[in-house]
A protein has these predicted regions:
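PLP-dependent aminotransferase-class I/II
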Residues: 127-143
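Glycine-rich helix-loop-beta junction characteristic of Rossmann-like nucleotide cofactor-binding loops
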Residues: 83-85, 106-109
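Conserved N-terminal alpha-helix of the aminotransferase class I/II PLP-enzyme fold
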Residues: 48-99, 124-131
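N-terminal glycine-rich, Lys/His-bearing helix-loop that initiates the first secondary-structure elements
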Residues: 1-61
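Glycine- and other small-residue-rich loops at beta-strand/loop junctions that grip anionic moieties
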Residues: 66, 93, 118-119, 140-143
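Conserved PLP-anchoring active-site segment centered on the Schiff-base-forming lysine
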Residues: 107-125
Length: 143
């Protein structure tokens, strides 16, 4: 959604969300495509090792970084979802529910904290609690 435009109705936001001209317009009056294309990428090539390390260090939106987190497909979807929530600061997308669970837990827990977790939790979530969180000094108590 371009800045300065009045807010669109939700149905319009769903259809138009996430469009950036750098992904959809050819420029020079040549037109373009309606929606950003799907970028399929598992590996991103860099000119040299220094550029790779800089990419890993900064991991900026808008810069190709890694196939599951760093292509216009992900950025376009994140932009569209953010536009649907006017008060949102942004949107983070994760390649799996396990990754999303780990980040959600790590975003609110600190070393020395104790997490109360239902005993019937999804097994990979238990693995996060028993492995990753434990290594960070976060205890888990099951109930």
């Amino acid at each position: 959604m371009s800045k300065g435009k009045p807010p669109s109705r939700p149905a319009t936001q769903i259809v138009e969300g996430g469009r950036r001209s750098e992904w959809t317009h050819l420029g020079g009056g040549k037109g373009g495509i309606v929606n950003p294309p799907v970028w399929r990428a598992s590996t991103i090539l860099y000119d040299d090792v220094a550029a790779l390390r800089a990419g890993v260090r900064t991991n900026e939106d808008g810069k190709l970084f890694y196939g599951r987190r760093g292509t216009p497909t992900q950025w376009s979807l994140a932009d569209a979802l953010t536009e649907m929530e006017p008060e949102a600061a942004g949107t983070m997308l994760y390649p799996s529910g396990v990754a999303a669970t780990a980040v959600a837990l790590l975003s609110v827990l600190n070393p020395g904290d104790e997490l109360l977790m239902v005993d019937s939790t999804y097994d990979p979530t238990r693995g996060i609690c028993e492995g990753l969180l434990k290594r960070f000094g976060i205890a888990t108590r099951y109930y």
